[in-house]
């Protein structure tokens, strides 16, 4: 049995699970990257991430050209902007820890997997937006897990690097029309208001968390975020049905962040 023999929903579920598995894998790969940095020097991670990114995108481009439809030329602006985002992410990493540059490539890959999962239900710009947002939110989970790890630290800067990797990758995959079909998509104002609510809720959680290092994170910082799914469940009929899968995915990724203030209350766990 291959993944193609599964139903679209089963394929999407498998892809989502792979995204979720990759986050703790990424968190626990840091000792490997650190060891390689010790052996080969910091210059190794100054050079390696851009090389991997170029090779990965080049490989995807080659595959795209092999199976390209004449009616779907490459969107050079989208690809160029995506590459720019990725290189900004590479430059934005802490210069004292060049090993962290690998996060750009990691989250570009997660965005690609999320794009495949969502492509069964979304198309066009909504597919770009929701897959990139999903990857970026998993990057936030990554940082909270780092904060709970005894040998890591929570940081907004690294979160921004993850975001740039996800959105940069998303723009590249969009420009290459990967897992995409030409179908019209509409977005209502209620969808935009709700997504804005989610964004504010996430910011109200992640920004104050910086000041709780070594402390128990107060649950109040997650209250605005927890209110969002309640509103969605009550008024879900007025949301745009065509993008409901994207809204549900990013809502789940965002609202599940509320578990971290609770985890900081467990004995033996120090958030830093």
Model-derived segments and spans:
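Bulky hydrophobic segments
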Residues: 1-141, 147, 156, 170-171, ...
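Pore- or pathway-lining transmembrane helices of multi-pass membrane proteins that form conduits
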Residues: 160-164
């Amino acid at each position: 049995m291959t993944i193609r023999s599964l139903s679209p929903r089963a394929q999407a579920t498998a892809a989502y699970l792979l995204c979720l598995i990759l986050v703790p894998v990424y968190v626990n790969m840091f000792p490997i990257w650190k060891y390689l940095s010790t052996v080969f020097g910091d210059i190794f991670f100054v050079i390696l991430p851009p090389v991997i990114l170029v090779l990965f995108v080049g490989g995807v481009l080659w595959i795209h050209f092999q199976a390209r439809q004449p009616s779907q030329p490459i969107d050079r602006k989208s690809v160029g902007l995506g590459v720019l985002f990725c290189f900004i992410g590479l430059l934005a990493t802490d210069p004292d820890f060049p090993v962290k540059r690998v996060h750009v490539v990691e989250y570009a890959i997660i965005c690609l997997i999320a794009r495949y999962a969502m492509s069964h239900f979304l198309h066009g710009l909504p597919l770009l937006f929701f897959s990139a947002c999903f990857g970026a939110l998993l990057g936030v989970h990554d940082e909270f897990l780092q904060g709970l790890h005894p040998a890591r630290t929570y940081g907004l800067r690294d979160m921004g690097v993850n975001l740039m990797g996800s959105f940069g990758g998303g723009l590249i995959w969009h420009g290459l029309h990967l897992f995409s079909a030409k179908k019209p998509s509409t977005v209502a104002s209620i969808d935009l208001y709700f997504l804005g609510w989610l964004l504010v809720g996430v910011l109200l959680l992640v920004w104050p968390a910086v000041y709780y290092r070594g402390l128990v994170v107060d649950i109040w910082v997650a209250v605005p975020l927890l209110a969002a799914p309640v509103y969605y469940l009550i008024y879900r009929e007025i949301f745009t049905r065509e993008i409901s899968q994207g809204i549900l995915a990013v809502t789940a990724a965002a609202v599940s962040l509320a578990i971290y203030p609770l985890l900081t209350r467990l004995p033996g766990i120090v958030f830093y």
